[in-house]
Amino acid sequence: MQQTASVNMQDFGYVEQFLDAMWMERGLAENTLASYRNDLMKLLQWMEANHYRLDFISLSGLQQYQSYLVDQDYKQTSRARMLSAIRRLFQYLHREKVRADDPSALLVSPKLPQRLPKDISEEQVDALLDAPDPNDPVELRDKAMLELLYATGLRVTELVSLTMENISLRQGVVRVTGKGGKERLVPMGENAIDWIETFIKQGRPALLGETSSDVVFPSKRARQMTRQTFWHRIKFYAVIAGIDTDHLSPHVLRHAFATHLLNYGADLRVVQMLLGHSDLSTTQIYTHVATERLKQIHSQHHPRA
């Protein structure tokens, strides 16, 4: 079965209506919507080539598409993500009475290996946070951002989109709008507060110049920084700190925040609230990282290990 670049326009319309509904009802971020669109366009292209339509494709047809993805060597994680988009689409079509049934409900999800978040030690975190030169406005901004990330466990997308009204230095909290438009208040800690205050007074005016902006951490062009740019900045400082960048991810400080809290006995549900996880099982993966770290310390320092 071949895949072509064309799609049925009626099916395309259904997908666009679905994406609009996801944006309005669930407040999904642009990145998530773009991922849904990309995955669903692949489905529509395959359907067009194989004479299926959204309003009559059966469970068997969707299973054929799953087999096609396996034949095309898509990773398990990619196939699981695509299946998630497909299920949401067919749930929507069933709800809107485009279909009398939901064939996706019986699809079997690919089994995913449990992946532990990439972990760095407290010493490596200290080295990373000490890498920026606070005498330079750009690096002072980066220093404040890194301190805030480690203090709060924010997602990178949440960090770069912060506005001045989201931060209360007096109360010591940051108000974050996370996935699905859910708001949460996260304490910042004195160290992060001090560096943010220093940046706002000394570094931010130098970056903004004559430009007005509500963004807390503007780029050199006085715009909102992209998450890709900030990831490049993290890798830049990791090299300075002597940390192997192959062992880093954009959320390295979010992972360190969660793992180190658990290492020091924080309650799992408190960590869940701080991270903005809707499901406790998502947070529980960090307990495995914390346990592995404790085992490592035990084997290194116990005389009978």
Swiss-Prot record:
Signal peptide: none annotated. The gene is xerD. Belongs to the 'phage' integrase family. XerD subfamily. GO terms for biological process: cell division; chromosome segregation; DNA transposition. CDD domains: INT_XerDC_C (cd00798). Residues 9-94 form the Core-binding (CB) domain. Keywords: Cell cycle, Cell division, Chromosome partition, Cytoplasm, DNA integration, DNA recombination, DNA-binding. It is found in: Cytoplasm. Residues 115-299 form the Tyr recombinase domain. InterPro entries: CB (IPR044068), DNA_brk_join_enz (IPR011010), Integrase-like_cat_sf (IPR013762), Integrase_catalytic (IPR002104), Integrase_recombinase_N (IPR010998), Integrase_SAM-like_N (IPR004107), Recomb_XerD (IPR011932), Tyrosine_recombinase_XerC/XerD (IPR023009). Its main location: cytoplasm. GO terms for molecular function: DNA binding; tyrosine-based site-specific recombinase activity. The active site is at residues 155, 179, 251, 254, 277, 286. Site-specific tyrosine recombinase, which acts by catalyzing the cutting and rejoining of the recombining DNA molecules. The XerC-XerD complex is essential to convert dimers of the bacterial chromosome into monomers to permit their segregation at cell division. It also contributes to the segregational stability of plasmids. The keyword Transmembrane does not apply. Forms a cyclic heterotetrameric complex composed of two molecules of XerC and two molecules of XerD. This is Tyrosine recombinase XerD. GO terms for cellular component: cytoplasm. The keyword Cell cycle applies.
